[in-house]
Amino acid sequence: AATKYPVGVVAPGAIGHDINVGVRLLGSSVNADLSADQIDTLADTLHEHIPTGSEAEGSLQLTKSEVDHVAQSGAQWALRKDLAQQDDLVRAEEGGRLNDADPSKVSDAARALGAKQLGTLGGGEHFIEINVVEEVFNRAAALTMGLKENTLVAQIHCGSRGYGRQICADYIERFQAVASKHDIDPPSPGLAAVPLDSSEAEDYMGAMCAAANFAYANRQVLAHRVREAFNEVLDGQGEAFHTVYDVAHNLGQIEMHQVEGRHIRCYVHRKGAARAFGPGTPGISLPYRALGQPVLVPGSMGEASWVLLAKRESMEISFGSACHGAGRTMSRHEVSHQGAVSPVDEELEAQDVSIRSGG
């Protein structure tokens, strides 16, 4: 959804609790012909290196001041800590950092969660997958991305963890308290909103960008852990993994778009959507500016994922946005009332997929 800036509203619930949940894709030159034992050892090692589960805590225990540094710097913080390569940032959306972050607008409750959760995957639909490049349709684009058939890639899907969730909860509560002042009656309490030109909106956007930077740093640390695991299992081949792209899903951003023939400054809410800027659009990482922004579409478990490129038409059709995944056949609420579910681990093992989970 998009509104003309600064006429519209901002709603934290419309951006989502998991601010800047997104996907980092790592490509490699590592041949996919691994033995079953190597695959199992790799799965075990990844699980040991990367804390999983909704309450997971990482090895990077930070002070509240350090959390603010992460929130201000994003993936650049990881580069300074030798947890990143320069090219990781070059091939990340916005260089892995939003400039408008304001950690002073973040609560101590959120900081406390961020202090113990950087470098953790989380639970629910968050995942790290090791995949194989099965088929290439555009060889020139694949060459730019460093993708080659029958090589290994890694997908990292996670976000800002409890830090971002607490920020969203804090601002939904705050916006509910001032709704009458702004004469805004949302369709549900979770969609509490304020005008974009209000002080409350300015505070939220500073905090949201802080959470986005935390998420960029989190995916970067996890990429480093993936490299460490491959170094351990495959004799140093972790260094063969490079960032193809890192794309955000749940964000609100100020962008220029053409509407009815006029260039309009818009505030674009992307919830469960990825940015998809067409070729030549400012803001695309330099390696991809001529091609169009990469769009990473993870498939359902056991199904294929896709690496796509945005076309110019996306700017006209969807404010430069695209789907962010395979989608759902039913909601989380419906699933919770479904009763017995199929044994997913058995189904995946039947497809020679090795799975590890942490709750």
Mark where each language-model region is:
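Patatin-like phospholipase
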Residues: 32
